[in-house]
Design a protein with these regions (language model features):
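Extracellular "spike/adhesin" assembly and maturation modules
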Residues: 1-162
C-alpha cells in the first residue's frame, strides 16, 4: 500500500481542528507522532518490501513536545528543530529487506516547508494541518531505501518509499 497524504491530512486535521484550540502541546505532539507512524506504516520500498517498524516514532512525540514547550525566538527555529526530530524518526524506518535508509536529501526541504508553515498564522487549523501533512509527505518521499531481495543471488535495489 502506498503512502497516502490524504490519510495523514485527515489525521492531522482531527488533531488540530478543535473548538477551543490545543492549549497543551504534549498530547497534541504525541498524536502527531502517532499520525506520522500511521502514515509511514503504509509505505513500501522500491523492492516491494513492506513496512516492518519505525522505532524512532516512540521518541518523536517527546521530541516534538520538547520543541513546542520551550520558548523560541522565532517560528523558524522551532520549525528547524521539528524537522530534525522528524529526520531522526524517519532514519529508523525499516522494511523487511532493507539494508540502509538515507533521509538527508529531504531535510532541507522539510525545514523550509515547516519554516514557511510556522512563519505566520494560518486562517484555520485545517489549512495548517493540510500544509503540515504536505510537508511531511514531501519529506518522506525523498528518503532513499536500499536493500536486498532474497534469492540466489540476492537482488539489490535502491529507491524511494512509496
Amino acid at each position: 500500500m502506498p503512502l497516502i497524504v490524504a490519510s495523514l491530512q485527515a489525521e492531522l486535521v482531527g488533531i488540530f481542528d478543535k473548538p477551543k484550540g490545543n492549549p497543551v502541546p504534549t498530547p497534541v505532539m504525541i498524536d502527531v507522532a502517532k499520525a506520522y507512524l500511521n502514515f509511514c506504516s503504509a509505505g513500501i520500498d522500491s523492492g516491494g518490501s513492506p513496512f516492518a517498524a519505525m522505532p524512532g516514532s516512540s521518541a518523536l512525540g517527546q521530541d516534538l513536545d520538547a520543541v513546542m514547550s520551550k520558548t523560541n525566538a522565532s517560528g523558524a527555529i522551532a520549525a528547524m528543530d521539528m524537522a530534525k526530530a522528524f529526520d531522526k524518526c524517519l532514519a529508523t524506518f525499516k522494511t523487511a529487506w532493507q539494508t540502509t535508509i538515507v533521509t538527508a536529501p529531504g531535510l532541507p526541504v522539510l525545514g523550509s516547508e515547516l519554516v514557511d508553515l510556522f512563519s505566520s498564522p494560518k486562517p484555520s487549523a485545517i489549512i495548517f494541518a493540510q500544509g503540515y501533512a504536505k510537508a511531511l509527505n514531501n519529506y518522506t518521499a525523498t528518503a532513499i531505501v536500499s536493500g536486498l531481495i532474497p534469492g540466489s543471488p540476492p537482488v539489490p535495489y535502491t529507491g524511494p518509499i512509496s
